[in-house]
Amino acid sequence: MSRSTPLKKVRNIGIAAHIDAGKTTTSERILFFTGMSHKIGEVHDGAATMDWMEQEKERGITITSAATTCFWKDHQINLIDTPGHVDFTIEVERSMRVLDGAVAVFCSVGGVQPQSETVWRQANKYGVPRIVFVNKMDRIGANFYNVEDQIRNRLKANPVPLQIPIGAEDNFKGVIDLVTMKALVWEDDTKPTDYVEKEIPAELKEKAEEYRTKMIEAVSETSDELMEKYLGGEELSLEEIKTGIKAGCLSLSIVPMLCGTAFKNKGVQPLLDAVVAYLPAPDEVPNIKGEYEDGTEVSVKSTDDGEFAGLAFKIMTDPFVGQLTFVRVYRGCLESGSYAYNSTKDKKERIGRLLKMHSNKREEIKVLYAGEIGAVVGLKDTLTGDTLASEKDKVILERMDFPDPVISVAVEPKTKADQEKMSIALNKLAQEDPSFRVSTDEESGQTIISGMGELHLEIIVDRMLREFKVEAEVGQPQVAYRETIRKTVEQEYKYAKQSGGRGQYGHVFLRLEPLEPGSGYEFVNDIKGGVIPKEYIPAVDKGVQEALQNGVLAGYPVEDVKVTVYDGSYHEVDSSEMAFKLAASMGFKEGARKAGAVILEPMMKVEVETPEDYMGDVIGDLNKRRGQVNSMDERGGNKIITAFCPLAEMFGYSTDLRSQTQGRATYSMEFDHYDEVPKNVADEIIKKRNG
């Protein structure tokens, strides 16, 4: 059975946006116009087909990226829905890995919001070409040109409008297509219709000419021959313009801009045309990098020929089929009923059924070809970020980085009988979401869950109740503090035990040095002349790593330190790995006490948007929370305050902010970096921990 859509005509795209820019509505309309869904779901009444988990329907925010397949002008579009809430950046990061292109949706009134910046950064990190859709052009205060400026100034990108709006707010009628120089008008507001091509209205002719010239200038810079033609005063043909836009889009040197209102069904068809015309096919993006077990690098080309290689990028539990693993195929093809090799875990997996998801319906298929995305039923050992490959070519594709959680809470089931159900539920949820961790507190025996923010953990507890019927009590949130050192010290430690028969002997000299924030842990072996035999060096490293788990001040993990073992001695008979491990571990602890140990806390980047009247109160309150105000800005008549605040001071902030501003301010917060805790606060923390 050969593929129904040639590789050239496949598009893997994500729709990325800030909350409320209208991303889900845009996805819905895409599914509608491509003929997949018959009744349009509105987010307002909680019926959108992409938002298929119950909590999303209630909260009206999109949490999990469902991958949906639809067709437009004989192209297959695999649409990956990405969440817009900052606690779910991990989901966005994960979908960015498997996208070839993205549609960034901005609200014509709100413009570039804090979350848009995060998503934009992630798209830059993975080199994802994107086009911009300025949505909600029918809203009061809609301004296409403002958004263009913000993309240039705040996101430091090069936006190139391919359309300009005809009217705005209530008078938004359609768009002027600058490529064909025609007006596209939607005449019926009430139902989804095709547009009508008309001549450009006289009052917009001059503006259209001005923007077309800007577009042609940008296009001519994408290649020498277009530049020559343009400078020589020749007209560029329609084909040349389109080729130039695509080249600029793929090289990330330009960001094509379109506009419309998805809710009123205007602008969606031209957006789909642009996806097909300007976003890349799987073989038009740089090959994905991979490596073999021995570390040799290899580049994996998107083609049906060649051994199978794919990436598992999402795991979900489906009430009817059980566990679904979403896979993007990069090379070769994956057949149902066959075997694949999980090269990350070194395990063979049987491929059960293969499904293509159409937002809430599923279609069973026999084969997934290169460049396609689908779900596999029944994988046992495969987790998010694992590579599936062929046994003949055990390539490991680049891994995804997942951030460490910054907030923890203790959970216990309401009834003792639910204890086992709760641990099954939590383990399932942790498999789906690598930024969520489950552990047990050794002293109290409590179950601790950790994640990227309060909302993240709320939703986990909520899902336990809905999907696994486990009601849980949640403790006070705990902050993930860390410890580090500020001074370089040298420390000798001798571990010697002589108690009849064979003794224990390990002797080390360690140098502890502070590293730049975010560097983690580095171990250096600087032993000369075999004063400690080679085979004991890994034990020294291991001993230090064990000591790093519990710092000397309050028992928090120690990071950003470099440890060098540079001298020592051993005993022919009594030395053992155990002895060197203990010597290193105790030596590190003793050294750390002299090295100016400090406690670090997670600092959050907080952005508050508030009416000007409340600005003083908001800033005063942030200062009370030990926040440092970083910048002030204006957006749409409101003040935007950006500050760095300790996570420990931000619990319950949403309630306080609401009461301070009568519910008129909004805020977003994401983890930014770790910073030293002031001495008085550190003393409190130490007292509490060592109580």
Curated annotation (Swiss-Prot):
<dbReference type="InterPro" id="IPR009000">
    <property type="entry name" value="Transl_B-barrel_sf"/>
</dbReference>
<keyword id="KW-0547">Nucleotide-binding</keyword>
<keyword id="KW-0648">Protein biosynthesis</keyword>
<protein>
    <recommendedName>
        <fullName>Elongation factor G</fullName>
    </recommendedName>
</protein>
<feature type="domain" description="tr-type G">
    <location>
        <begin position="8"/>
        <end position="283"/>
    </location>
</feature>
<dbReference type="GO" id="GO:0003746">
    <property type="term" value="F:translation elongation factor activity"/>
</dbReference>
<dbReference type="InterPro" id="IPR027417">
    <property type="entry name" value="P-loop_NTPase"/>
</dbReference>
<dbReference type="InterPro" id="IPR031157">
    <property type="entry name" value="G_TR_CS"/>
</dbReference>
<keyword id="KW-0963">Cytoplasm</keyword>
<keyword id="KW-0251">Elongation factor</keyword>
<dbReference type="Pfam" id="PF00009">
    <property type="entry name" value="GTP_EFTU"/>
</dbReference>
<dbReference type="InterPro" id="IPR005225">
    <property type="entry name" value="Small_GTP-bd"/>
</dbReference>
<dbReference type="InterPro" id="IPR009022">
    <property type="entry name" value="EFG_III"/>
</dbReference>
<dbReference type="Pfam" id="PF14492">
    <property type="entry name" value="EFG_III"/>
</dbReference>
<keyword id="KW-0342">GTP-binding</keyword>
<dbReference type="InterPro" id="IPR047872">
    <property type="entry name" value="EFG_IV"/>
</dbReference>
<dbReference type="GO" id="GO:0003924">
    <property type="term" value="F:GTPase activity"/>
</dbReference>
<dbReference type="Pfam" id="PF00679">
    <property type="entry name" value="EFG_C"/>
</dbReference>
<dbReference type="InterPro" id="IPR014721">
    <property type="entry name" value="Ribsml_uS5_D2-typ_fold_subgr"/>
</dbReference>
<dbReference type="Pfam" id="PF22042">
    <property type="entry name" value="EF-G_D2"/>
</dbReference>
<dbReference type="InterPro" id="IPR053905">
    <property type="entry name" value="EF-G-like_DII"/>
</dbReference>
<dbReference type="InterPro" id="IPR041095">
    <property type="entry name" value="EFG_II"/>
</dbReference>
<dbReference type="InterPro" id="IPR035649">
    <property type="entry name" value="EFG_V"/>
</dbReference>
<dbReference type="InterPro" id="IPR000795">
    <property type="entry name" value="T_Tr_GTP-bd_dom"/>
</dbReference>
<comment type="similarity">
    <text>Belongs to the TRAFAC class translation factor GTPase superfamily. Classic translation factor GTPase family. EF-G/EF-2 subfamily.</text>
</comment>
<dbReference type="GO" id="GO:0032790">
    <property type="term" value="P:ribosome disassembly"/>
</dbReference>
<feature type="binding site">
    <location>
        <begin position="81"/>
        <end position="85"/>
    </location>
    <ligand>
        <name>GTP</name>
    </ligand>
</feature>
<dbReference type="InterPro" id="IPR035647">
    <property type="entry name" value="EFG_III/V"/>
</dbReference>
<comment type="function">
    <text>Catalyzes the GTP-dependent ribosomal translocation step during translation elongation. During this step, the ribosome changes from the pre-translocational (PRE) to the post-translocational (POST) state as the newly formed A-site-bound peptidyl-tRNA and P-site-bound deacylated tRNA move to the P and E sites, respectively. Catalyzes the coordinated movement of the two tRNA molecules, the mRNA and conformational changes in the ribosome.</text>
</comment>
<feature type="binding site">
    <location>
        <begin position="135"/>
        <end position="138"/>
    </location>
    <ligand>
        <name>GTP</name>
    </ligand>
</feature>
<feature type="binding site">
    <location>
        <begin position="17"/>
        <end position="24"/>
    </location>
    <ligand>
        <name>GTP</name>
    </ligand>
</feature>
<dbReference type="InterPro" id="IPR005517">
    <property type="entry name" value="Transl_elong_EFG/EF2_IV"/>
</dbReference>
<dbReference type="Pfam" id="PF03764">
    <property type="entry name" value="EFG_IV"/>
</dbReference>
<dbReference type="InterPro" id="IPR020568">
    <property type="entry name" value="Ribosomal_Su5_D2-typ_SF"/>
</dbReference>
<dbReference type="GO" id="GO:0005737">
    <property type="term" value="C:cytoplasm"/>
</dbReference>
<dbReference type="InterPro" id="IPR000640">
    <property type="entry name" value="EFG_V-like"/>
</dbReference>
<dbReference type="InterPro" id="IPR004540">
    <property type="entry name" value="Transl_elong_EFG/EF2"/>
</dbReference>
<dbReference type="GO" id="GO:0005525">
    <property type="term" value="F:GTP binding"/>
</dbReference>
